[in-house]
């Protein structure tokens, strides 16, 4: 289809899976057709939460204590004690995430996650607020505070009324500026281009020491409930402007 249409540029609006992990980006590279968003390597690394956190750490970004669980690992002997969060290492959109509050839930988790054919990442739970920052062509837009009844699940992300987005986030100026700075550094550390969105967890009681980067998304959602269009609108950019910027930045071999 792509060869028949022979487009000048491909706007990659895919989300998750092969559309986000470097696979489709690799196809565009083989076809030598410029495409939007991040390239093969950046996309693949960002999709691997464990590896991307290692890179963030080398660039001085604070990350949460974690442990990578392989298929044969059992949860009983892990050093990180509840409360913690466990999620697919290469997943997205909060699919498959479990929040474990009590040790009694471990056996249930062993049945769910033990001997599976994919890796999972276990992270110490950090109480506090969920913050996020979009970066467009290297510049941060603003900080959004994501308010939910419990935690930012799949339903909270995509269902109308599932979460409340406070723009700009009502947080201290130093934390606000730190979020912007961290988001740009994360974008640069993975060699990303186009638009990305970095998610943070902030424990208010600990101030600057309580701010952690969770992950970076190279294919952030662009729906009416999505965070990037909301942030862009707040800073005076409409969806058309974002799309034009991404198309102008489209390229191969980056």
Give the positions of each predicted feature:
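Conserved N-proximal alpha/beta basic substrate-recognition cap immediately N-terminal to
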Residues: 1-65
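Active-site nucleotide/adenylate-binding loops and adjacent lid/helix of ATP-dependent enzymes
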Residues: 2-4, 45-123, 127-128, 181
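Glycine/Thr-rich phosphate-binding loops of Rossmann-like dinucleotide-binding domains
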Residues: 20-21, 94, 131
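A glycine- and small-aliphatic-rich helix-loop capping segment at beta-alpha/alpha-beta transitions
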Residues: 26-35, 102-107, 234-235
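Phosphate-binding site of ATP-dependent enzymes
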Residues: 101-181, 201, 206-212
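Conserved metal-phosphate-binding beta-hairpin within the catalytic cores
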Residues: 124, 133, 187-222, 232
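C-terminal active-site "lid" helix and adjoining low-complexity regulatory extension at the edge
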Residues: 206-254
């Amino acid at each position: 289809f792509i060869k028949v249409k022979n487009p000048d540029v491909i706007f990659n609006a895919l989300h998750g899976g092969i559309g986000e992990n470097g696979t489709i980006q690799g196809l565009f590279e083989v076809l030598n057709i410029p495409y939007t968003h991040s390239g093969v390597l950046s996309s693949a690394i960002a999709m691997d939460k464990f590896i991307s956190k290692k890179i963030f750490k080398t660039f001085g970004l604070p990350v949460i204590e974690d442990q990578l669980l392989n298929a044969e690992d059992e949860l009983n002997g892990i050093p990180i004690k509840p409360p913690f969060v466990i999620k697919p290492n290469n997943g997205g959109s909060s699919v498959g995430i479990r929040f474990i509050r009590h040790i009694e839930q471990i056996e249930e988790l062993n049945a769910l996650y033990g001997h599976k054919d994919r890796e999972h990442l276990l992270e110490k739970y950090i109480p506090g607020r969920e913050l996020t920052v979009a970066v467009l062509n290297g510049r941060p837009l603003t900080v959004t505070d994501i308010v939910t009844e419990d935690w930012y699940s799949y339903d909270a992300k995509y269902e109308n009324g599932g979460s409340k987005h406070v723009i700009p986030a009502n947080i201290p100026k130093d934390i606000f500026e730190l979020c912007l700075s961290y988001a740009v550094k994360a974008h640069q550390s993975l060699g990303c281009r186009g638009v990305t969105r970095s998610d943070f967890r902030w424990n208010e009681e600990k101030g600057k020491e309580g701010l952690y980067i969770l992950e970076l998304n190279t294919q952030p959602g662009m729906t009416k409930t999505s965070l990037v269009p909301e942030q862009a609108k707040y800073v005076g950019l409409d969806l058309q402007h974002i799309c034009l910027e991404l198309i102008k930045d489209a390229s191969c071999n980056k």
